[in-house]
Amino acid sequence: MDYIVGFVSISLVALLYFLLFKPKHTNLPPSPPAWPIVGHLPDLISKNSPPFLDYMSNIAQKYGPLIHLKFGLHSSIFASTKEAAMEVLQTNDKVLSGRQPLPCFRIKPHIDYSILWSDSNSYWKKGRKILHTEIFSQKMLQAQEKNRERVAGNLVNFIMTKVGDVVELRSWLFGCALNVLGHVVFSKDVFEYSDQSDEVGMDKLIHGMLMTGGDFDVASYFPVLARFDLHGLKRKMDEQFKLLIKIWEGEVLARRANRNPEPKDMLDVLIANDFNEHQINAMFMETFGPGSDTNSNIIEWALAQLIKNPDKLAKLREELDRVVGRSSTVKESHFSELPYLQACVKETMRLYPPISIMIPHRCMETCQVMGYTIPKGMDVHVNAHAIGRDPKDWKDPLKFQPERFLDSDIEYNGKQFQFIPFGSGRRICPGRPLAVRIIPLVLASLVHAFGWELPDGVPNEKLDMEELFTLSLCMAKPLRVIPKVRI
């Protein structure tokens, strides 16, 4: 009903806009047949529409590696092969480095101080430099290593109290990721494990903002309507963000009053670099939001695949028992001796990249990609989900086979375009050095400490792996398991 009301209310406005400002671009990439005004939108929202990622895969196979889609009055380009991704993220990295935030994220004053949604201007360069050289530097990550291990241990200890029960891990994995980020940001846990809580804490607010960002918004497809906030998403996002600020503003004020001469976390670093309160709030939100959601989703996917494939799980357990031992706990110092663990994480990211359709790169100036003309102002998306499942680059692409990475030189650095879970080029995810530490640490801790069974006698091979894509890619049905003690 929400869709119908939205389309009826805007049809006349859209028609007028279409007639007055009909695009005159030529030499665009190929495009499937489209409806007048609404473009390809009905292909996504009709009753029999396939899931979005399946739809994107199908049309890429039919129309080629670079396609042009029109959702309402918003046109976008989608790159779905490693060759197309290379031209977008490497050849045209600079000219395709712009950003256009989703309407619901355009809340003042946050959007004016955003790094994630900023064009590659001087403020963006300063923020990215601080993230790379200080906050996610080797030195600071090493200094926080024990905190990450303690956070992973706390998760294991809590699950120990649930041994034999049917549990959903998702909220606890999300909270664990939040606590890791809490120590990155201001050296504190921000989530407490509990069975039930009605308290609206940081976890619920951040999760709420992520859900709001993934909701249907007619303004995303008909930009002329953005000012009206027809679904109330921008208002809702603003309310949630203000509540988040209240949680950490006391810590920010206290640190300003007592500056740390040797910065130990993000807050210290930002204060030392004279960031104002709006800049700090924006940086905090863009650390907690994307980092908690993507990291926890990957861990859930990895554990689900291992449960579904008992031979892979047994192989990983054998490696952990041999290297870590049954009387010890997993440490980051073990990583260099755990190649199969690393292969399991990479294979999970190949199948389920953290951001399956990357945040769009806005074209700053008209450019050429694969012989096609991309006009100034158009958004270009890279489909990492399709690239990671391309049969030209991956044998049996839909199978979970960590072994494919054991004798491979493929890394997370975005240089090999068949595997770009964190993106590539100047817009590569700045939190990558943290993610490749916390994901294997938590996954290994869960596999090492527990045996896992599916409830109701469901065979492992019948585990439901249906995907749900919003801002990120998660399991459509949260993983429900029964933990059994191993160590």
UniProtKB/Swiss-Prot annotation:
Any one GO molecular-function label of the UniProt entry: berbamunine synthase activity
Record localization: Endoplasmic reticulum membrane; Microsome membrane
Cofactor: heme
Keywords carried by this UniProt record: Alkaloid metabolism, Endoplasmic reticulum, Heme, Iron, Membrane, Metal-binding, Microsome, Monooxygenase, Oxidoreductase
Residues given in the record as heme binding sites: 429
Main localization (coarse): endoplasmic reticulum
One BP term from GO: berbamunine biosynthetic process
Bilayer topology: Peripheral membrane protein
GO CC entries: endoplasmic reticulum membrane
InterPro entries noted in UniProt: Cyt_P450, Cyt_P450_CS, Cyt_P450_E_grp-I, Cyt_P450_sf
Domain of life: Eukaryota
CDD domains: CYP76-like
Reactions that this protein is recorded to catalyse: (R)-N-methylcoclaurine + (S)-N-methylcoclaurine + reduced [NADPH--hemoprotein reductase] + O2 = berbamunine + oxidized [NADPH--hemoprotein reductase] + 2 H2O + H(+)
Pathway: Alkaloid biosynthesis; berbamunine biosynthesis; berbamunine from (R)-N-methylcoclaurine and (S)-N-methylcoclaurine: step 1/1
Entries under Pfam families matching the protein: p450
Enzyme nomenclature, EC number: 1.14.19.66
Protein family according to the UniProt entry: Belongs to the cytochrome P450 family.
Biological role: Forms the bisbenzylisoquinoline alkaloid berbamunine by phenol oxidation of N-methylcoclaurine without the incorporation of oxygen into the product. Oxidatively couples either two molecules of (R)-N-methylcoclaurine to form the (R,R) dimer guattegaumerine or one molecule each of (R)- and (S)-N-methylcoclaurine to form the (R,S) dimer berbamunine.
PANTHER family: CYTOCHROME P450, CYTOCHROME P450, FAMILY 76, SUBFAMILY C, POLYPEPTIDE 5-RELATED
Name this protein carries in UniProt: Berbamunine synthase
Organism: Berberis stolonifera (Barberry)
Native organism taxonomy: Eukaryota, Viridiplantae, Streptophyta, Embryophyta, Tracheophyta
